[in-house]
């Protein structure tokens, strides 16, 4: 791993290619280039967003920002970058061996890269590898189950200030990192890892909470954590930041599951897809007045819902290959019949409605789209940063 543990320095801007997590801080947008690093975009003028740098961080999928320090995964490490001057980002620190998303083999080291090819491998039910997500073959090839390989590390404001006076950025609903006060919360497929940022450039892994398999997203709201999984939504009491305790689990059919919370209502999107092994495409509206006993209020049929955001009484929804949609959610019974707007023609998987601005930032396979949402029924496209293949 030493070759990946070099000081990270900004490089010239790159073209977007394989976009992932989306993050907003001050007048800047941070876009994950899956497995490669982070694009920094000056968004002072949303009609003319300007890429200004690329941070090459191998193995990166996730990020969070607190007090001008960017925290990002770098394979099995957590790295810290000083972004006080986004044009001159400085490497600030590293905490080693705190993530286990990559398999370690005693004779070979960490598996961090592979070239993919499609092949059908038949196993008998008595084979020791039957039921495993991945395994090595005798000829040295590594075999992944198709569902597992499609579920690599994915994927709440412009700046807000928490009760401790810390400036925290704004993440999308597919986020797997979340910063609350002086703690960074990170989810893997099965646990929650809590980093103490008392020394902000030397983050300490302070606590690990086992949750269960299929964990996908984390959304903090007030003193609670709402954790989306492929089988439901976990609600945790986070009044003790190092020891979150489970209050409840709202279950649903197996499907991909981001969560957004406003007031006493949680909005959960379910979608089909290989990695989810499900066939539901819907928006669930859940009453969380009693956090220990969440109750389904309604399910609304959607096309292929992904990330979402709520502003006032409007739902901003990324509907996969069907584009970007806006719904009136003032009456939970009527959401599906109250579509206010539909912007087709591009793929959308996550959205941030920027705090204090009539601005929606949407990320997808086609690139980064920005919309003026001063009239929710008529979102106006301001700009596009397209991926290199589009």
State where each predicted segment sits.
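Feature marking well-ordered beta-strand scaffolds used for ligand recognition
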Residues: 1-390
């Amino acid at each position: 791993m030493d070759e990946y543990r070099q000081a990270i320095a900004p490089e010239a801007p790159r073209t977007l290619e394989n976009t992932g997590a989306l993050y907003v801080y001050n007048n800047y947008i941070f876009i994950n280039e899956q497995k490669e690093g982070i694009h920094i975009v000056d968004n002072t003028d949303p009609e003319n967003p300007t890429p200004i740098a690329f941070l090459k961080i191998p193995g990166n999928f996730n990020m969070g920002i607190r007090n001008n320090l960017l925290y990002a995964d770098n394979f099995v490490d957590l790295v810290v970058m000083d972004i006080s001057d986004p044009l001159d980002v400085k490497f600030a620190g590293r905490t080693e061996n705190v993530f286990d998303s990559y398999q370690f083999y005693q004779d070979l080291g960490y598996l961090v890269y592979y070239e993919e090819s499609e092949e059908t491998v038949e196993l008998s039910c008595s084979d020791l590898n039957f039921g495993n997500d991945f395994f090595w073959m005798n000829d040295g090839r590594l075999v992944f189950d198709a569902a597992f390989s499609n579920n690599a590390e994915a994927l709440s404001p412009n700046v807000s200030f928490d009760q401790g006076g810390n400036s925290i950025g704004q993440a999308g609903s597919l986020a797997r990192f979340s910063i609350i006060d002086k703690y960074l919360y990170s989810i893997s497929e099965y646990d929650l890892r809590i980093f103490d940022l008392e020394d902000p450039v030397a983050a300490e892994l302070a606590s690990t909470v086992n949750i269960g398999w299929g964990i996908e997203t984390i959304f903090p709201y007030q003193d609670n954590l709402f954790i989306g999984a492929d089988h439901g939504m976990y609600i945790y009491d986070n009044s003790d930041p190092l020891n979150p305790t489970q209050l409840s689990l709202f279950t649903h059919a197996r499907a991909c599951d981001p969560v957004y919370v406003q007031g006493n209502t949680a909005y959960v999107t379910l979608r089909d897809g290989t990695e989810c092994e499900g066939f539901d495409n819907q928006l669930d509206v859940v009453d969380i007045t009693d956090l220990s006993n969440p109750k389904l209020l309604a399910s609304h049929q959607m096309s292929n819902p992904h990330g979402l955001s709520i502003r006032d009484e409007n739902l901003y929804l990324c509907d996969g290959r069907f584009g970007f949609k806006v719904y009136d959610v003032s009456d939970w019974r009527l959401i599906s019949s109250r579509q206010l707007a539909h912007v087709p023609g591009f793929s959308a998987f996550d959205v941030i409605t920027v705090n204090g601005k009539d601005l929606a930032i949407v990320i997808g396979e086609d690139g980064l789209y920005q919309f003026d949402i001063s009239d929710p029924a008529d979102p106006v496209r301001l700009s596009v940063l397209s991926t290199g293949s589009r």
